[in-house]
Amino acid sequence: MNIALIAHDKKKSDMIQFAIAYRDILADHTLYATGTTGLRVKEATGLPIHRFQSGPLGGDQQIGALIADNAMDLVLFFRDPLTAQPHEPDVSALIRLCDVYTIPLATNMGTAEILVRNLNKGTFDFRDVAKNGGTNETT
């Protein structure tokens, strides 16, 4: 599965801790991330990560494009709800795209843990259904 990792500045340490804790699960998937988040997670875990621009410089939109193309399966976006973000319209657009295209979205470590543990158990069949036009055939 394709997984996006995004974290606002005050949540980057949470994302790094999460990626270290779930490194073995994340290693089985293709990872994408916005600029600094991807760099810091890669440095901490050694995981290969396709890095886009920083969020405010278009990285959120680049990940959004993958969502719109049905090429993203899960988004882990650790948001800082207490700090105003200069690129808030991009953040809102990304969240809206997750809703439009039925992409699971975790905005905090607790939800991310539930999603990643279930991903590891193989309970994300609905993504195969979405990719196969409403059938559960994986051929």
UniProtKB/Swiss-Prot annotation:
Keywords: Lyase. Transmembrane segments: none annotated. Residues 1-139 form the MGS-like domain. It comes from the Bacteria. It holds the Pfam family MGS. The active site is at D60 (proton donor/acceptor). It catalyses: dihydroxyacetone phosphate = methylglyoxal + phosphate. GO terms for biological process: methylglyoxal biosynthetic process. The keyword Lyase applies. GO terms for molecular function: methylglyoxal synthase activity. GO terms for cellular component: cytosol. Its EC number is 4.2.3.3. The keyword Nucleotide-binding does not apply. Substrate binds at H8, K12, T34, G35, T36, T37, S54, G55, H87. Gene3D superfamilies: Methylglyoxal synthase-like domain. Belongs to the methylglyoxal synthase family. Catalyzes the formation of methylglyoxal from dihydroxyacetone phosphate. This is Methylglyoxal synthase. It comes from Bacillus pumilus (strain SAFR-032).
